[in-house]
Every structure is written in C-alpha cells, then in structure tokens.
Amino acid sequence: MEQAPEDQGPQREPYNQWALELLEELKNEAVRHFPRIWLHGLGQHIYETYGDTWAGVEAIIRILQQLLFIHFRIGCRHSRIGIIRQRRARNGASRS
C-alpha cells in the first residue's frame, strides 16, 4: 500500500510567527498609503469584533491585503502598479 513520503523538506517557521511577521509588514506598508486614523479605526473594529485572538490577526491580515491590492490596482501615486487613469485634454477637440 502506498504511503505519503516523510516530510524531508526544510523546517518551516511556526504559523504564528509567520502570521505576526506578515501582519507587521502589511502594517508598515499600509501606513505609507492610508491615513493613520483609518487604520486605527480598522484596528479598533477588529479588536471589538474578535478580541485579542488569532482570528482577529487573520482577519486584519486579510483586510489589509485586500485594501492594499485594491489601492494598487486602482493606481497608487507612489507605485507604477495599477491602472493609470488619464484625463482627457480640454483643448476644444471634444465631442459635440
């Protein structure tokens, strides 16, 4: 009967440590793109909803990832990633 191979790959860091490092990176990036008062409000909402739990950590990671993705997708002034909306020239050559 076939058996799954033994895990002989490199040792992975614990999930909790990885999640906290990821959250720290996301927070550092988020403060560069969003007002601190918004981020503080988000943190308060997560804390009131989940308390000091891993579910709260996972929720804020997910929300920050989504916010940053959408922010970059729309077009961040600090980044070359995203859709850059160009304004139409108003030189009298518009449609009538």
Swiss-Prot record:
A single Gene Ontology CC term: host cell nucleus
Places the protein is found: Virion; Host nucleus; Host extracellular space
Keyword Transcription assigned: yes
GO biological process, one term: protein homooligomerization
Keywords: Activator, AIDS, Apoptosis, Cell cycle, Host G2/M cell cycle arrest by virus, Host nucleus, Host-virus interaction, Ion channel, Ion transport, Modulation of host cell cycle by virus, Phosphoprotein, Transcription, Transcription regulation, Transport, Viral penetration into host nucleus, Virion, Virus entry into host cell
Similarity-based family: Belongs to the HIV-1 VPR protein family.
Other observations noted: HIV-1 lineages are divided in three main groups, M (for Major), O (for Outlier), and N (for New, or Non-M, Non-O). The vast majority of strains found worldwide belong to the group M. Group O seems to be endemic to and largely confined to Cameroon and neighboring countries in West Central Africa, where these viruses represent a small minority of HIV-1 strains. The group N is represented by a limited number of isolates from Cameroonian persons. The group M is further subdivided in 9 clades or subtypes (A to D, F to H, J and K).
Name of protein: Protein Vpr
Source organism of this protein record: Human immunodeficiency virus type 1 group M subtype B (isolate MN) (HIV-1)
Record gene name: vpr
